[in-house]
Every structure is written in structure tokens, then in C-alpha cells.
């Protein structure tokens, strides 16, 4: 605003907080042109709002991890808004990115989800004095295994669908939290949403949605379920809906999704609901 900055970088939670700041409309952001969205998968609706409301028409997505220095893929400013909002772009030049089947370590064909893996000049030599940890993440072919689930399309663009450990398995059905999150973000009352698995003695896991409501808005559990009904598969509709003020975060602003299961169990216990 004051310095007339032209670029803005951050993780999705930062952009979401900025977009929903009560004084957002008081700032002149028209000098913004570009930026980088990275650090965590970005909701499609958030990316579109950053382009439209924050004037970052040339913002791109970058995907990677610290062990990859820290990038593997990136979209381009010349890509369409839809591509930049829904994918993390293509592999960096001179870097090999593959989607590998976690069970067989074989490359998945386009359109088939698997683990995002990378090989190239950007990959670390290893963890300092920890060969066991290094061997656990870099395979014998030199590919770094990210632990992230992704899919590549016919044009070489990658889309992140979640974390392998965060995938919910309900009665044998694989459920990707990000798919449900992207759908729920379309509800105008929702500022932020995170989806995680809640233990279930019958199905193994049930879908839990942790929703932060926009200031001045109201929302009920039934309204959320009605919004989902007929739009997504029944088994993907959250059984448990929690309205929260925030999420467990790292110092760098990333959401600690792995802690949400315990948060959900605690909130259910407070309601007198025992699930395990």
C-alpha cells in the first residue's frame, strides 16, 4: 500500500488472512502485479480471489519442499488463470518430476494419482549425519519422495491432491481431503476449511470438516450437509462438522493438519460423543 509493492509472496493461510482482514477494503493494492503462492496446497477459490481482489494477475504457484531447494514445479505467468489456479505448473527446467505408485514405485500414467517424486540438481545430498533418514526419502534411483499425492495431466501440468498420510480411508474408499476442501470453499460463508479423518469403529475413518466462518456470517452443520448433498459423493460428505476459530499452525504459517484428528476427538468428547 504505502511502498507501492508490485509482488507479494506467501503461503495460502497468509493470503486467506489478508483477504478476510476487516480493513482489507481500506488498502490500495492496485500496484500489485505478481507473486508466488507456495508452502501448501492452495484452495482454487483463494487463488482466484488473489488474482481478482488483490490484483495479482500474474501470480504463480510453486511446489516443492526444503529437500528440493525448495522447488520442483512452477506455473508460468503466461499460463491461463484456470491453469495457475488449479495446478502447480510443470517441472523446473533440467529437473525430472514423476508421479510414482507408492506400492510399486512404478510411474503412474497421466491422470492417475501417485506420489510426487523428483530427481535433479536441486535435490539435497542428504540429511546431515543421518544416512538412515536419507535412504528413507531418496530411493536407489535418486528420486526424492515427497510424501505428497499428485497427478499429472497430458500436458505435463501437476496437481497436488493431498498428503499420503492425510488420505482418509472410509470403509475401503479413498477420500482426498483437498477435494472436499476445494468444494466447501465455494460456500460464501466459509473463510477457511480443513478436512481430516476421524477414527470410526465401523468404517475405520469418517470425514471431519473444521470450518472457520467469515466474520459477520452464520452457518449450521445442516446447511453444510445440504450444500454437499447431490454435489459430491455421499461417502465424502462430512459426518462431523466443527466450527473453529483457528487451526494448529507452524511458526511459518502452515497448518498442522495431523493434529486435527486429536482436536476433533476432543471436541466430540466435549459434546459427549465417543467414537473410539
Feature roles, as predicted:
Residues 41, 81-129, 137:
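Adenylate-forming AMP-binding core of the ANL superfamily, especially NRPS adenylation
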Residues 1, 8, 21, 120, ...:
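AMP-binding/adenylate-forming catalytic core of the ANL superfamily
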Residues 96-103, 244-252:
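Active-site and channel-lining beta-strand-loop segments
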Amino acid at each position: 500500500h504505502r511502498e507501492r509493492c508490485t509482488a507479494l509472496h506467501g503461503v495460502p493461510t497468509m493470503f486467506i488472512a489478508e483477504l478476510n482482514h476487516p480493513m482489507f477494503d481500506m488498502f490500495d493494492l492496485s500496484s500489485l502485479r505478481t507473486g508466488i503462492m507456495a508452502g501448501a496446497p492452495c484452495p482454487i477459490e483463494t487463488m482466484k480471489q488473489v488474482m481478482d481482489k488483490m490484483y495479482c494477475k500474474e501470480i504463480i504457484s510453486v511446489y516443492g519442499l526444503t529437500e528440493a531447494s525448495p522447488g520442483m514445479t512452477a506455473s508460468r505467468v503466461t499460463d491461463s488463470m484456470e491453469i495457475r489456479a488449479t495446478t502447480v505448473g510443470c517441472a523446473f527446467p533440467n529437473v525430472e518430476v514423476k508421479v510414482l505408485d507408492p506400492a510399486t514405485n512404478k510411474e503412474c500414467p497421466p491422470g492417475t494419482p501417485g506420489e510426487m517424486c523428483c530427481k535433479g540438481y536441486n535435490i539435497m545430498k542428504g540429511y546431515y549425519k543421518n544416512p538412515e533418514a536419507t535412504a528413507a526419502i531418496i530411493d536407489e534411483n535418486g528420486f526424492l519422495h515427497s510424501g505428497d499425492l499428485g497427478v499429472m495431466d497430458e500436458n505435463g501440468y501437476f496437481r497436488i491432491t493431498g498428503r499420503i498420510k492425510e488420505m482418509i480411508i472410509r470403509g475401503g474408499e479413498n477420500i482426498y481431503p483437498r477435494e472436499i476442501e476445494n468444494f466447501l470453499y465455494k460456500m460464501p460463508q466459509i473463510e477457511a476449511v480443513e478436512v481430516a479423518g476421524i477414527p470410526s469403529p465401523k468404517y475405520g475413518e469418517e470425514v471431519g470438516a473444521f470450518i472457520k466462518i467469515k466474520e459477520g456470517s452464520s452457518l449450521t452443520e445442516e446447511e453444510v450437509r445440504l450444500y454437499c448433498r447431490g454435489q459430491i459423493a455421499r461417502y465424502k460428505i462430512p459426518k462431523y462438522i466443527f466450527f473453529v476459530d483457528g487451526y494448529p499452525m507452524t511458526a511459518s504459517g502452515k497448518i498442522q493438519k495431523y493434529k486435527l484428528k486429536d482436536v476433533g476427538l476432543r471436541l466430540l468428547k466435549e459434546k459427549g460423543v465417543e467414537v473410539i
